[in-house]
Amino acid sequence: MSFLLLTPPPCLLIPPPPLSHRRSSSLFLKHPFQPSPRPLSFCKPSALRLRANTTVNSLKALETIKPYLQSESKTVLLGWLCSCVSVVSLSQIVPRLGSFTSNLNANAASLTKLKGECLVLAGLVLAKVVAYYLQQAFLWEAALNTVYKIRVFAYRRVLERELEFFEGGNGISSGDIAYRITAEASEVADTIYALLNTVVPSAIQISVMTAHMIVASPALTLVSAMVIPSVALLIAYLGDRLRKISRKAQIASAQLSTYLNEVLPAILFVKANNAEISESVRFQRFARADLDERFKKKKMKSLIPQIVQVMYLGSLSIFCVGAVILAGSSLSSSAIVSFVASLAFLIDPVQDLGKAYNELKQGEPAIERLFDLTSLESKVIERPEAIQLEKVAGEVELCDISFKYDENMLPVLDGLNLHIKAGETVALVGPSGGGKTTLIKLLLRLYEPSSGSIIIDKIDIKDIKLESLRKHVGLVSQDTTLFSGTIADNIGYRDLTTGIDMKRVELAAKTANADEFIRNLPEGYNTGVGPRGSSLSGGQKQRLAIARALYQKSSILILDEATSALDSLSELLVREALERVMQDHTVIVIAHRLETVMMAQRVFLVERGKLKELNRSSLLSTHKDSLTSAGLVI
């Protein structure tokens, strides 16, 4: 019980949702086309998972679960209490079976007593059935609530990671993360339930049934005990094999999930390139690898319980010995019946222990991979003394900023200095890969600069709370991100869980030139946008993105190629919205379109990590041709 008395992590304060659990099943079908399941170069296991310690043993796996199970101790105790009731009922059934058989040939005077025994037996059986049902219900509740807390905490830690974790080659793909938090978390729930429902209840039942067997015949009990050690050693060996096979199976499933998460969102690109057949072949490679590894796991999982069946062979020898003892001793037939019944009820919990060990070894890799997510630490760390900004004027200073994505790479930014006054609009132009977007990521503190500092209103951004910094710096990118939901949900995204202010939503939409088209939609602001905003045009999505940035009342706005992919009319509407926004915001514009660049008061060229100011008036004459030929403006 001591393992339940640990301090829970902060995530455990989150109330659990209504319970639901559904076991997944596997269907193994042969397919006439079975290509070699060679791993593809872009989808190596090393790119899909953390470099976790593969020698995690069972005790360590259990240790990681303890804090999350602590708040479920009351539910677990109720389940184990029901288990005690079930075992006590069963222990009362065993001796009554012996007396019941001895009374079968009794005279008529004993029939009344026999009827009474039948009623008692029926009552005990009913009590056992009800208690066992409640035991399972309570323990499933504890297991599912525990995994819910682990899921919430793991996902929170993923969201807290810096951008490098998702963009670098050593992180985890989104498909792998989704697989861990869904499918593998369900396997962890199965493992926790198997342990809770087996270890203590089976130990109680084994103890009670063994006591009955000893009372009936110590000699027969000794013969029974001789079977157990050899079987236990074999189960331990096979369990270790199962853990290794299970890990390979989970990696194969994660690869398949990652592949689907990459290809399905790009279905337009696939069809445009007539790649349906090639993608089908690639899918079959991953699916075949997943099938093969799962099949190995299922075969090993099926083998271990069968080993426990060897104990039944041992019981045959016990019956033979029992017959000899009965023939040459005073052991009654009722005692033999009690012993055999106790042995039958003993074999089930011993077999359940084997199955629980089976579940533990199968679940260990899932526990390890899920808890890899909870152990993630962000490289962008908020200082304890960081302050909350109530109001921001919008002055931005970049002081000797240098940055490179990897120690072995050349600097993307090299000693860059820039001072932007509050309310000023600055445009950044330059070739792709020159460092423009990197500069924006540093301003949002998605990365830490290699050297130098970024100052907002005379305060180093490292001294500002991350939530406060990103509240006052709004981003509108070329690739607009919209989530399934209504237009109001997407504009008021920041307040989605706390309550959206519809007046602010409508005001932001009007400023962003979006109110008119929104009101022409069937349900206005309550119109669904579809997956990733699929029901809206590019211009409409871009205006919603501007409205979203305005809704959060950001003093500093970053426009990263906000008009590059729009048609002329949409671009005109977006530019009109931007002109209104620029009147009372500090705006940093990254653009290639000359019309958008000329909206800025100052223009800078970012090239090879350096910053050079361009004469704004000469952009229309002297520098225009050279910038256009270099592809810096269009």
Curated annotation (Swiss-Prot):
The encoding gene: ABCB29
Q: How does it sit in the membrane?
A: Multi-pass membrane protein
Organism, by scientific name, is Arabidopsis thaliana
Binding of ATP: at which residues? G430, P431, S432, G433, G434, G435, K436, T437
Indicate where this protein resides in the cell: Plastid, Chloroplast membrane
**SMART domains from the xrefs?**
AAA
Tell me where the transmembrane regions lie.
75-95, 119-139, 195-215, 219-239, 307-327, 330-350
**Any GO MF annotation of the entry:** ATP binding
The identity of this protein, by name, is ABC transporter B family member 29, chloroplastic
* Presequence positions on this chain: 1-51
The record's family statement is: Belongs to the ABC transporter superfamily. ABCB family. Multidrug resistance exporter (TC 3.A.1.201) subfamily.
Give one Pfam hit by family name.
ABC_tran
